[in-house]
Amino acid sequence: MVCSSFIRSFIVQAGCRIGVLAQGRHQFIHIKKTLSVGFGFRTSVIGFRTTSGIGFRTSAKMMVDTSAGEKRISLVDMPPEKVDDGGYIGGGWKNDDGSLSCGYCSFRGKRSTMEDFYDIKASTIEGQAVCMFGIFDGHGGSRAAEYLKEHLFNNLMKHPQFLTDTKLALNETYKQTDVAFLESEKDTYRDDGSTASAAVLVGNHLYVANVGDSRTIVSKAGKAIALSDDHKPNRSDERKRIESAGGVIMWAGTWRVGGVLAMSRAFGNRMLKQFVVAEPEIQDLEIDHEAELLVLASDGLWDVVPNEDAVALAQSEEEPEAAARKLTDTAFSRGSADNITCIVVKFRHDKTESPKIETNAMAESEPELNPTTELEPESNPSTALETESIPKAELESEPDAIPDPKPETEPETKGEKAGE
């Protein structure tokens, strides 16, 4: 850690002296001009009620379009954090009709510092309900992750096409916020970086934008489906992209960009910015009656808890905040050496569309059922959980992916933060 920190410090100081951010400053000026354009929205605040012991304070944050004189966004912020005796930060809320509920838990774990941040926001924009959930896992310091918590979703809602073209808005906001962060740090010798895994729900349509190795999964009809793909340097497509830009992938305990950073995309990391971009990969889906829950988490969870286990654990608790706490405790008990932060979002769907089955009709059909097919789920409940995500081992075994030359060293580096 001392060696890598020294290398980063040396590189950052050299980069600051030669003025590598001239282009970034020019882009930032353009961003400021873009974000200063006003748009008037008719808005109302979504009401929430608390579902845990934490008291919730809601405040409306108004952003005013001075050219039109209308209120643009009325935003309900998350309440102040509350820490219990064990050092856990957590709580939860649900909307008025109970169709959506959310719980979160954040824990420093075995690390001496906390570099994980999260953000949860909800609002109504032009009559459209919007909810945003984000996990930001910092490396090399906490400044980048904290900056994303403070600015990413606010910047997103200011984008003129947030509602009409949400994918475009997410893509541009991620890249613009990255440039803005680098500009804000231009006079420092720090080289902080961060992941960002964000789930944005616009009405019933979900968008997941990911940069880095935090992850978002959804449970649909009992299946654990990954909605993001970890950005690792030895991912074949990422390796080709980095090498095409003139970068190198080196082994230093794990595969790293330039021998320094153990992820291929991130916010910040100015001296690797040519290779380590903040352009998100975005997936979207409709939240229908099969969608049961979302889990967003930092790699402190995913290092030791597979997608299928995460869904099973989250489903085992009725309240999402209890599910988030259970996931965090499980990761810690399984040996996670990292900060652990997760958000669980649960959906409740009305079942009115299901036909009512008469008792005598069920009795007549029972002899035709195969009893073995009914007993299978009870004999092994875990078989009901399937996954459509790509296993990490499968990714690394692709023909053009970089093989692990020292697999025996992996247990020693598990939980190690990227770039340290």
Curated annotation (Swiss-Prot):
Essential cofactor(s): Mg(2+); Mn(2+)
Region (Disordered): 353-420
Catalyzed reaction equations: O-phospho-L-seryl-[protein] + H2O = L-seryl-[protein] + phosphate; O-phospho-L-threonyl-[protein] + H2O = L-threonyl-[protein] + phosphate
Composition bias type Basic and acidic residues, residue spans: 403-420
Binding positions for Mn(2+) 2 per the UniProt entry: 137, 299, 338
Disulfide bonds: none
Domain PPM-type phosphatase residues, every copy: 101-347
Positions of Mn(2+) 1 binding: 137-138
The record's free-text note on cofactor binding: Binds 2 magnesium or manganese ions per subunit.
Enzyme Commission code(s) on record: 3.1.3.16
Gene Ontology MF, one: protein serine/threonine phosphatase activity
Pfam families: PP2C
GO cellular component, one term: plastid
Keywords, in A-Z order: Hydrolase, Magnesium, Manganese, Metal-binding, Protein phosphatase
Top-level division of the source organism's lineage: Eukaryota
Family to which this protein belongs: Belongs to the PP2C family.
Listed name of the protein: Probable protein phosphatase 2C 76
Originating species: Arabidopsis thaliana (Mouse-ear cress)
Lineage: Eukaryota, Viridiplantae, Streptophyta, Embryophyta, Tracheophyta
